[in-house]
From Swiss-Prot:
This is Tegument protein UL51 homolog. Coiled coil: none annotated. The keyword Iron-sulfur does not apply. The gene is 55. Keywords: Host cytoplasm, Host Golgi apparatus, Lipoprotein, Palmitate, Phosphoprotein, Virion, Virion tegument. It comes from Equine herpesvirus 2 (strain 86/87) (EHV-2). The keyword Transcription does not apply. It comes from the Viruses. Phosphorylated. It is found in: Virion tegument; Host cytoplasm; Host Golgi apparatus. One of its GO terms (cellular component) is host cell Golgi apparatus.
Length: 224
């Protein structure tokens, strides 16, 4: 028994008939609407092509290069922040680390604002301005190398045992100085282990000022 609302196909049963592709009317009215223009571009692109592919031409090559350089800087900052968020920073290092993290986040916000301006405003920045921005990022993060060492230590050792000796390592004298201090001769040699008492009451008073020497001037004697 067959019915009109039942259709048999080679792939199965379609109770309400075989579905057809939904029809979408092509927008042919051009208005000053960024969302409409964006939808038209997305609709008109061939399969497998994105808006980013369209920018990879001679006109957008400079913008892509600059955006890539800024993205690398932002990714590096994100990596630092993720490292320090994954471990517990000792209390003795929290003030220094917090100050550097605040600088890194402020620089990352500057980079993000620049990339947003390049994407939304369709503008590019010249190489000199980009170098100034990157140099500013390096200037405001002068302790990046020290943070790299600290981050490497945090990554290698997840515990906080390594931080217990930081103060002693920083404040202790160098090894050569320590060895020299260890083999230095004592000022007072007291083999009996006693202590020499000094009577402060018998301490002599201030030394009097020296008497100036008599003058040895020559006096001319008239000849007789």
């Amino acid at each position: 028994m067959s019915s009109r609302w039942i259709q048999w196909t080679c792939c199965g049963l379609w109770p309400f008939g075989k579905s057809s592709r939904q029809y979408r009317q092509i927008i042919n009215v051009y208005e000053d609407d960024s969302e409409r223009v964006r939808a038209e571009i997305d609709m008109g692109l061939p399969p497998g092509v994105s808006v980013g592919d369209l920018l990879q031409n001679r006109q957008g090559e400079e913008a892509i290069r600059q955006a890539h350089m800024l993205a690398l800087q932002s990714n590096a900052i994100t990596d630092y922040l993720q490292r320090f968020d994954s471990v517990r920073v000792p209390e003795s290092c929290q003030s220094i680390v917090s100050a550097q993290i605040a600088k890194l986040r402020s620089v990352q916000h500057i980079i993000w604002n620049t990339m947003i301006s390049m994407a939304v405003g369709n503008v590019t920045i010249d190489d000199s301005t980009l170098k100034v921005l990157l140099n500013k990022q390096a200037g405001e993060s002068m302790a990046l190398m020290e943070m790299e060492k600290l981050a490497a230590a945090l990554k290698m050792d997840g515990s906080t045992d390594w931080a217990q000796n930081i103060a002693s390592v920083v404040t202790a004298p160098p090894r050569a100085a320590r060895e020299q201090m260890a083999f230095r001769e004592p000022i007072y040699d007291d083999p009996e282990g006693g202590m020499e008492m000094i009577d402060l009451s018998s301490t002599p008073g201030p030394t009097p000022a020296p008497t100036p020497a008599p003058s040895m001037e020559r006096v001319a004697v008239p000849a007789s």
